[in-house]
Amino acid sequence: MNVGVKVREISTGSIGVIEKGNNQNGFFVNFGSRKNWKRNNEVEVIQNTIDNSNGKQSTTPKPIAQQQQQQQPPPQQSQQQPPQPLKPIPATRPVPTIPKVQSEDPGPRFGNFTLPTTNSSTKYSTLPSRQFFEVSSSPGDENGTFKRSAAPPPPSSLSSNQNGSNLNKVQSPSRPSIPSFEPPTQQPTQPLQKSPRNVPIVPKRTNPSPPSPPLQSPQPTPQQQPPPLKPIPQPQQQQQQQQQQQQQQQQQQQQQQQQQQQQQQPPPLKPIPQPQQSQPTQPIKSQIQIPITNTNGNTNGHSSLVEKSPRNNESTATTATTKDMWNIDYKELKFVGNEIGSGKYGSVSLGYWLGTPVAIKKLHENNEETEILVQRELQILKEIRHPQIVQFLGVSRNEKDEIHIITEFMDGGDLFDALIFGDIPLTWKEKLRISLDIAQSCRFLHARGILHRDLKSQNILLSTNRRAKLCDLGLARMFEERINKRYTCVGTEIWMAPEVCLDQSYSTAVDVFSFGIVLVEIITEKIPDERFPQHRFQFDAPAFLKKVPKECPPDFSKLCVDCTKYNPKERPSFIKVLDTIQNIYDSLPDDDEENYD
């Protein structure tokens, strides 16, 4: 190897210059971005920058591999077979790289990148040699690449030529030789001619030949023709098939359910033959049934009590039985004694219905207003079932078309008579128990969107064990608090809330105010004071506190004042009322008499 020889690395195409070094070989290749070549790689000499015309040879020490190669005798070659020349390397023009000055790094580098180093070697200078600058400044072609050297001579002349201008292969002394990376020569392939079915593919001839007629594929006979393939079902067809299968399954299930229902259903009764009438007659009022529906609105006229059944095979007798569920035959009622009470819309009498004691409420008038109230009360009572609300049993009409409402009988009378005219006074434990029953019934109604609007002591009935139940829901109505509406002034003025008397919009707070007036009756055992419009029907709390007995629990009287506040938003809800009364009731000692809890 000569110093200053320009070489190319075969594997990467990088251009470098051989320079003198202090390593084992005595020289190294400077590629600009790195020094020395990769291990087990080969370089190609492409230009010698030193003029050897005077016959002077470089005194650069040769690598050990090259010395061993010179000492060994040349291999014996056959005289009959001349040496084959080397194939030229494909004309690939390497891209010139800008040399960079850096310290020697004998280790391998991949990708032509370097790492910054701070310590420089003290063996020799880190500046590039003169030969490197001559190679980097040598002129190139128009594209800026170096000119390619002439083709290398045959291998026989490699041993005689020592100037480094021919191709030299330098191998690492410690590693075996690497096979040549030259791409193999490929002969141009010729396109194959497409052949018809059942005919082997034959390549075209290279020699020129006269044009031959095109090959014709043999027509298959009917016996040789393959059977037609079934069309692959498309996704839409699969979906349609699945839908059809699902529909068939649903139809089968429906048929099975119908068969089971027919087996379980008893045979229909034959309708009783009715005598034919020549002319239609109008129904008698006593035979008209009061409509009771599950809707919130009022029904006028003589509509059906129950909606039509979805079954088409339902008998007439079954439908008539369903319609008569809330209608009681007047002949089944038996009145006992005189009236036991009266109200604004009717009087109450004691009676028996099929041997059961009941309360029969007879309405005074039978007009449109009464009809609306009856329908409203029946609609509400029919859907309400609560231990602290009087149970509704049905409705009946007599021959005079008088409406009678039948409910359960409460043998203790109403709360007003027990407080004002009662012979046996109520203990504070019983008063709190009655107040708790009233609050529970009102809480139940409000949870279902129902206002009573006429809560007073006359509409609270007692049993013999001093338990209270709420009755007379004729003025109750369904409400929706989100709708700010003005309602008509109804109820009794002493127990009515100020917003109802002033014809303002109201909500559940009106029942809380009426409950507070009932607490005034329970605490004082007197009729509440009248409220006047000049004071905007406001409750006089100081006057009430003067009438409170000393035995009354303080929290009980305070709850009464809170429930009767003028501002509806300041009144407590029935949930809080229940908690307060329950705490007061638990704090009191038990009565000496029998505990009816």
From Swiss-Prot:
Class of the enzyme per the UniProt entry, highest EC level: transferase
Domain (Protein kinase): residue spans on this chain: 334-585
Ranges annotated as biased composition (Pro residues): 72-97, 208-234, 265-274
GO CC terms, sorted: cytoplasm
Keyword line: ATP-binding, Kinase, Nucleotide-binding, Serine/threonine-protein kinase, Transferase
Coiled-coil residue spans: none
Protein name, UniProt field: Probable serine/threonine-protein kinase DDB_G0281745
Bias (Low complexity) ranges: 157-168, 235-264, 275-301
Entry EC number(s): 2.7.11.1
Organism: Dictyostelium discoideum
Catalytic activity of the protein: L-seryl-[protein] + ATP = O-phospho-L-seryl-[protein] + ADP + H(+); L-threonyl-[protein] + ATP = O-phospho-L-threonyl-[protein] + ADP + H(+)
Region Disordered, annotated ranges: 49-320
Compositionally skewed regions (Polar residues) per UniProt: 49-61, 114-140
Family: Belongs to the protein kinase superfamily. TKL Ser/Thr protein kinase family.
GO BP of this protein: signal transduction
